[in-house]
Amino acid sequence: NWQGVSDVEVGSNAFNLDDYNQTNGDTGGMNFYDDPYNTTTKWNDIWTFTEQATTAVDGIRKSPAMETEDRETMLAYLGEALTLRALGYFELVRWWGDVPFKENAASSDLSNVYIGKCDKDTIYNHIIADLKEAIGYLPWQGKGTYNAERVTKGFAYGLLARVALFAGGWSVRDGNTFPDLKLEHHPTIAEMNGFFVGRPKNYQDYYQIALDACADLLADPENPHQLDPDFEEVWEKVNHLELNPYNENLFEVAFGEGQSGDVGATMGYTLGNGVTNASRGMGGTGYASTTLYYFYSFDPEDKRRDVTCAFPSYEMVDGVAKETMRLNPLGVSCGKWRWYWMTDEYLQRLEVATSRISTGINWILMRYPDIYLMFAEAQNELHGPTEVEARTGLSAAAALEVVRTRAFGAGSAKVKDYDGSSKEAFFNAIINERAWEFGCECI
């Protein structure tokens, strides 16, 4: 899930000259000097996940239970499988662009396994269709056993919007392998050796798909999702292995304490070796961190800043546990994961740990503010920042301000302190807001 070097996060040892050529994990792939073919575990794991989801789709569609009284349950399972397959292919395309694509599970004779690359537009169109189908089958979060650890209707809407925005956006294109695609070339980025930055000529159709997905979710009276009024509580709850009471988290990858997951153990607030009775520390910048430059991009009154960026480190100094401050400008800890928010059971295990203990902290793949910001982006692109969308009663600017209101507090003048003077200026405001809202979440 780690996205390597971005404008917000820094991958493990991202600027270390000695790690760029590692091939036995993804550390090399996160490095600034990276060889992109080093991302072996990510490539293998996402393909395995995607193939398993495809197998589930095939099996459910062919299941005799689809013709019984269990049909509604089976359709919900189908919606989950379609969404997970879409997620898998989306991650593959996001990382590697044009990749092999097939709608059916691998055949026993391997006749559909060794296939060539498919252009990303075709893949996007397939998974957009899958997600539209899935939305019709999936229950809302909170219905029966469907909580944030299961794929539900809200996440399918959100993933549809995310995929559509990528599909309609600019990306690197291979004009050598796919010369016949109807694409618009970027006006200011030059072509090089047949590769260019382009987007579909009908890109606005994809923005409309994204807008519809967000608006339909926001306007649905059965929609159970809200923003948690307290930004810090979002992270206290997930660290404490609790589901968010406002259903802010549309989907969490589920882990189990002592069984799986190292979120918080290899990233987050730093607890040095020997601070507890254990010889093993936790937190720090092992998987991902951020930078001092990102910290200073925040408004000082933004409540998200001191939750997202953490400088303290608890270390043994002359035999005494002391709070010190991290001074590396490229190694600021991700504060959304903190050992003192974790469960008592986990902290008791930590007291005697000699090796890493799985924290069980779920990985949040999408939160509800993403819906508001994707709505704002799509509405702005199609209609500008101030025109009101009929289903939601929101303009792009109003949607942005929903997110900023939590960050600064209702009534704060800072809520409207952004440049919305033009479509282009407002787009840049959304880019900045996404960085401040989702920092260290590696999305």
Which residue ranges define each predicted feature?
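C-terminal structured "cap/appendage" subdomains that terminate the fold
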Residues: L382, A396-I443
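Acidic, serine/threonine/proline-rich low-complexity intrinsically disordered regions
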Residues: A105-A106, Y114-K117, S171-Q208, N362-R367, ...
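Conserved, well-structured interaction surfaces
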Residues: L17-W96, S111-A148, G335-M366, I371-M374, ...
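An aromatic- and glycine-enriched ligand-binding surface/loop that stacks and positions planar moieties
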Residues: N1-N24, G97-V99, E103, Y124, ...
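Extracellular structured ligand-interaction cores
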Residues: A76, T83, D98, V151-G158, ...
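Structural recognition of the beta-strand scaffold that forms the well-ordered cores
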Residues: L92-R94, P100-K102, N249-V253, L365, ...
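Carbohydrate-binding/catalytic loop surfaces
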Residues: L110, E232-G258, R338, D344-R349, ...
